């Protein structure tokens, strides 16, 4: 894979990638000129086709992890019978410890009261409940009741989160 900023090989074109996705600009043909903002030089980067695919996959991964963290953070207080402010989540596209995409739900109480341990014990139930909650939600692209409002976490958050939850639920059954 050629490094970012390298020249294209003869006969192989480069792709233009929107750093902030085009769809986030609410472009309406003939009604606004939002496409101009989306296509400003500061929002564009030129990538080789392979790098472009990786960039798109990275955005989907971030969306899925963000949606998962949102769903789990909303469900966890119900299982723990605690205030939602007692727990917090962290999303890492490449965690330095796991070296993999990681969501951590943890308690915010100094010295802890056992929420983290209980969350670990409940992880299968939480993942099943999250899958059920997101699947049953009638929204199309995400909402505050499931994976967060559309566009606040990333593109296709609900779809990406559902895919991730299905995989995680299958793995926890093994």
Regions found by a protein language model. Give the residues of each.
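Generic recognition of well-ordered alpha-helical segments
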Residues: 43, 47-50, 129
